[in-house]
């Protein structure tokens, strides 16, 4: 089936089966709560370090120490959300398989199948964390140079390199979860078979992952806009925009989750 047809059919599926939105809506709501919490902590840290007064040297150590507990809570929450994100993502292969076979979809049944692939999800979780750490370490010196020189191009160059690396990783891992959940494969077999399929369909996967990477970047930009632009008298506008962007985010991420197993079912 042509790639464009797969994208169109996946979009139609969202319309026919609104229940499919539930897992991503739940994770998006939880992420939103954590992001609001992080925003509050970030504001407190900025005040404690004198950032708003333009005096970053006037740091109150006592206040910063008091915020360390909050930072630990944020870190633990993000790790939990990553786990929840992977589980909800792994529900979609079972949902799409049942729909493609003409059977009614079951959120409970798909959750059980996703949990059954916990070893694969654990390996993917570790890989994501390591990639995030490596990407952050790689970007850090470029960000420091950009702050010192005022040349944003240094930071943009590093961010571009990380995005290219992320695109390659997304292509390689694209079929791993569908293989693990639908075919009931173990960790090694899921990765081996997933990699083989990725190489076989690398052109289509490059196009589809680039498309989704652009969508995700636009969504992230909208999210940042919603969180930073409106204050004071425009507080109501800020809340409306924030909620709207979160709904858009949930829809786009659900679409990504649907296309992934739908594509696999067409090419396996």
PLM features: residue spans?
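Short, small/hydrophobic-residue-rich motifs at membrane-helix boundaries and re-entrant hairpins
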Residues: 4-8, 15, 19-101, 132, ...
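Alpha-helical membrane-spanning segments of integral membrane proteins, especially the hydrophobic core
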Residues: 69-77, 105-132, 155-163
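Short, membrane-exposed interhelical loops at transmembrane-helix boundaries
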Residues: 56-64, 230-241
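Nonpolar helix-loop interface/hinge motif
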Residues: 1-44, 104-108, 163-235
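Residue-level signature of the transmembrane alpha-helical core
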Residues: 25, 29, 79, 95, ...
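Selective recognition of hydrophobic, aromatic-rich stretches within alpha-helical transmembrane segments
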Residues: 69-101, 143-146, 150-188, 237-268
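Short membrane-interface loop/juxtamembrane segments of multi-pass integral membrane proteins
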Residues: 62-66, 113-114, 194-201
